[in-house]
Amino acid sequence: MTRNLEKKMSIREDAQQGKVTPLFEQCAAVESMSVERLMAGVSDGTIAITKNKNHAFSKVIAIGAGTSTKVNANLGSSKDINSLEEELKKLAVAIKAGADTIMDLSMGGDLQKIRQEILKNCSVPLGTVPIYQVAAEVVAAGKEIVDMTVERMFEVIEQQAKDGVDFMTIHCGINRHLQERLKNQPRTMGVVSRGGSFTLDWMNHHKRENPMYEYFDDLLAILKEHEVTLSLGDGIRPGCLADATDRNQIQELITLGELTERAWAAGVQVIVEGPGHMPLNQIKANVLLQKQMCKGAPFYVLGPLVTDIAPGYDHITGAIGGAIAASAGADYLCYVTPAEHLKLPNCSDVHEGVIASKIAAHAADIVKGLPGAIEKDNAMAKCRKELDWKGQIELSIDPAKSAQYRHEGGGDATDACSMCGEFCALKVFERSQK
């Protein structure tokens, strides 16, 4: 392998050519793996490094085989609630809680300004869904979503790439064939992906192919120029347990697998998105299907949410599914907040969502046998045995909450807790051994 400090356009091509760069060295160090192994993963597409050449940030990450399970936090304004100040607060909360990436899903207010300010303040990779901006613009102009133009779709993608967006969710897997299949196999909830529904609405109205599928090569050219990772959106993901793993979902996945290989051939890195709502016993099979269909490309799942009846607690339903999915081989969890299905999340919701998904990711990393994962739990066990409360708080996934609960329980002045006090099992056992 050769040493090369020059900035190259394509991270994937650098890896394929065996050119060691500071980016590869930094990611390998974070993941406790050799540079050679990391580069082999980037070369064969099983690892993606989401880093736009126009975005300077401090926390570069690798997503995929052999790396720690990553967590994404979604932010963004809505038409009804659009405060840049609030979104920047959410950004800070998400990053402090441990989010590895951020997605700006804004659809209200000055979208360009919101995105650029988030980019400026974002110390981790930032993703977007460009069709959101296109749809929001036409609606703000008093028109309908179907009035989006192909030209504007590509203009927005290119502008966001130039601004520094690191990865983009684009629903390329929806095509005319899948459109007909949806008519032939009705669903309980139809299509729940906003980007997917916008795309299908446009296709139905214009009787045309999905522009992101039809002009896929043009899309790849833009993404490669700016080193944007393509996150292939699952526009037909199931929105309820009843729709999970149906023919519609799997047909889109087959298409995403084909598009993955085309993107790789063009020198573009790929992440593949997945469900969604899904019963526990279907999650492992879905991960296996994605890994087979998409040749091991990193798998990015929303949850999955394992029940439909827990609004207000969907950060828990999502964490349960996320732990199972990641332990089965999924690489990247999109967080779910307690506000899911109910409202736009606030700062508290964002914090709770990130922590829940970080717990799921860590639990999966233990199963994956990743370096340093179980060691954290072993260190916690040692602190608990020794009643080292300071150590326990420092090791916890949410130190502030641990400290708060300890204080509220009156534990500051004792080595026990208010649950057991003098009946502490650890103390009794220790005494019995003397």
UniProtKB/Swiss-Prot annotation:
Belongs to the ThiC family. InterPro entries: ThiC (IPR037509), ThiC/Bza_core_dom (IPR038521), ThiC/BzaA/B (IPR002817). It catalyses: 5-amino-1-(5-phospho-beta-D-ribosyl)imidazole + S-adenosyl-L-methionine = 4-amino-2-methyl-5-(phosphooxymethyl)pyrimidine + CO + 5'-deoxyadenosine + formate + L-methionine + 3 H(+). Its cofactor is [4Fe-4S] cluster. Coiled coil: none annotated. Pathway: Cofactor biosynthesis; thiamine diphosphate biosynthesis. Keywords: 4Fe-4S, Iron, Iron-sulfur, Lyase, Metal-binding, S-adenosyl-L-methionine, Thiamine biosynthesis, Zinc. The keyword Lyase applies. Homodimer. This is Phosphomethylpyrimidine synthase. GO terms for biological process: thiamine biosynthetic process; thiamine diphosphate biosynthetic process. Catalyzes the synthesis of the hydroxymethylpyrimidine phosphate (HMP-P) moiety of thiamine from aminoimidazole ribotide (AIR) in a radical S-adenosyl-L-methionine (SAM)-dependent reaction. NCBIfam families: PRK13352.1, thiC. Its EC number is 4.1.99.17. [4Fe-4S] cluster binds at residues 417, 420, 424.
